[in-house]
């Protein structure tokens, strides 16, 4: 019996060995792809050795290919439970090699944490939090700590392997070189402490930790007496006799007075407890302005120190008092806590800061809210206060101008002793990279903030408010910012640099609650790098070391003279002072802006003058009621009342009056002001900058008027109309020209891609992309640079773009297969940059417009030219092709027809395999070469509009398309059929790759397209019809896919439904 068992075991080992040999041979073969590697990571997650080897293989692929699979790598990291640390180490290693990889991974993890936060105890949340913590520490921290000196924890398996390696190295020295990285990687894995009491003692453990902190802070020796006298508390499992022991000793020593049974089932719980005590509080996220103002953040200021509610001195104040000679990174209030946390890890001992941290962390979440992280300057300004103790609401209001100046002085004094000549090259490079990551994340946050502000502005004033906000944002450009993924590939070691946003070309895309907007961004290709020896970077390092760039893209500060002084020489200096929109002298006859509130004010009442005084004192007008407020402070409520009171005093004009009250007439005399001050670029920029500030204030007034009391309802409408009229007048002063007036844009419904570039070069659709680009270059102050370029992107907030990004990834994978198999089809490779769970940037399609807009514009023109009946007639795509490409027998038309056929075949197969729904003409684009492309993949795979399978056809193939292709007997249609067959058969060869991409992403994924769970990939595989022969596949495509789609009644009904409900032309 024993021999049979031993023989069976030997046989199994032999089979396992052969499998491993075959796997090794596959991995090392030339045909092994990156996708194969990601797929094997999922299958062999339980084997640490194989998992480690696969991760080492991953590192050999180019960074461009690795960036493509970042969503899958992150998904594997958080969903595949494994003891291996190899993938986590690989991601941290790649972030040091490629800044784009670091940013994309950071944003992807940040978005995933939003989903995982519903279950903080899950494996995925713990891993994502740990990796995000490490990423933030390395990306935003400028300290010279070494990543190599990482503590190896008490892990038995790596320790045994290490011991064996040392012994075997005597006979085989090369073994240590191979095994050492694996041992170090696994040794860093956080392990739980096994010497812990039973599960029922967890609550007592927390109470005892709090008691221990209190006793240590008071430095008393009453620990035994207090512990024994607390009859309401069970016997303490913590021995506090020797206070110099470490936290781990004090927390996990067995009590000498009672015998406690050990329960090893709670190992993971204790590991989580230790993790939260020592690590979670040090998570550092980029500074983000608070969404809500909460009274829970009120603390006392006394002698320059922030006093928490429990009476302990905050760590921020201690850092300011005790580390004045050290450099402190200007990233946020949590930085000081992180430094304390790092010191604790290095020394292993306890300090008063440790006690405070433990006491406070018990009441805080493990993952801080991005919107509640305060700028470090808030603490600095508090620390600079002197005099008697007083309460200071340090987090309820943004900084005033004086507080901002004081904070910059404090920050400057903290870092002025840094000598750049004493820093190593590595430290300088790290400072440059940290500055780049800070600028990137702050820029993304600023775009999100603008969208949130626009959502609170009336629809009519959104475009004016958008241009004002973008003009203010431009004050911090040029900056070390590029747009990963969306901009063209960089040269090795170089990055693109954003220089300005063309504010007068920006567009609000629709009037929905979520306000996406179009940006045209000017940038210089391959403009900057991280070489600390270059002249430009030397100046930048001086700026960073002097802490001059602490605030960037911060829309809360309206007076930015200090920041403008530090801008690059190529940017224009902004105006020093700002006046309020309530100051009627600001733009009258070019009067001096320094007069402010003079004795000759045109106010009709003392209350109005009082409002002006308050407004001039409060510089941060941009935030006034632009966000929803929880637990409003008294000051905010008071200011709101003053605004309403001021609005009530604005005289109501008769209907036949053309004049505005002086308070609202801030834009009429702009030309006079510019002429009086002298027509030069600096003055024009300065005056327009001031105008942007005042437009923001007008937007604030509109938001306030919408909340006005009932007794003011009659006057509010008139005042509101006056403000909007003034804003539109200023909007014209920015150089904006309405596309409706210029190009006869089709209809009121501006779909997102209709304003991307201006559209195809025809008389009824507008200028093409090349013309627009050249026009902007001629008027740009950076257009003379040889590496100048222009890009258009859509900024979205409030929508989860990860599903659409996954769709574009799948389409690009299919396009790569078609290129490899030499199938002559065309696909637009769209890109999306995810910056959080509900924000992102979307690439636009240049020289393309939706079929809806083309039809509507052409219909209007044909009716005007009497070529179409105005009673129900609608222009067709063939009419558009005839006007755009000429004679049907000409080369230009035939080429456009061929382009239409090749692109239609590709998207037909894509729509069938991915089950793309909502295929109305607003989501189908035609470019200036005749190519068709689909956008908006909000409904695909498992979900459909209204959860109803309304679109039953495999893809959209209308009679209009057939007419454009020359009919069912036309050569173009026959080519379409053949290309559809070829493209479908080519994808069938790589069905496993496409299905596995779906399988990896569907696990524990909350995106709507994965509502069917595991059945999502099963159904996708079924659509490939892998059981059919080649001949049967041809029949399936021609008779089922094309035959069922051609002129489908379901397609016609859905188009008619969209026409009736949304006004989208069918």
Curated annotation (Swiss-Prot):
Q: Where is this region: Activation loop?
A: 934-958
Provide the top EC class: transferase
Tell me the function of this protein. Acts on phosphatidylinositol (PI) in the first committed step in the production of the second messenger inositol 1,4,5,-trisphosphate. PIK1 is part of a nuclear phosphoinositide cycle and could control cytokinesis through the actin cytoskeleton. Involved in the response to mating pheromone.
Where is the sequence biased in composition, kind Acidic residues? 342-356
Q: Which domain of life is it from?
A: Eukaryota
The annotated subunit structure for this chain is: Interacts with FRQ1.
Annotated ranges, domain PIK helical: 1-133
Question: In this chain, where does the modification Phosphothreonine occur?
Answer: 394
What other comment is given for this protein? Present with 1600 molecules/cell in log phase SD medium.
PTM annotation (Phosphoserine): residues: 10, 236, 384, 396, 592
Q: Which GO terms describe its biological process?
A: cellular response to nitrogen starvation; endocytosis; microlipophagy; phosphatidylinositol phosphate biosynthetic process; phosphatidylinositol-mediated signaling; positive regulation of autophagosome assembly; positive regulation of Golgi to plasma membrane protein transport; positive regulation of protein secretion
Biological source species? Saccharomyces cerevisiae (strain ATCC 204508 / S288c) (Baker's yeast)
Q: Per the record, which residues fall in region G-loop? A: 776-782
Q: What is this protein called?
A: Phosphatidylinositol 4-kinase PIK1
Q: Please give the SMART domains that the UniProt record associates with this protein.
A: PI3Kc
Residue ranges for the region (Disordered) are 218-240, 303-411, 564-624
Domain PI3K/PI4K catalytic per the UniProt entry, residue ranges: 770-1049
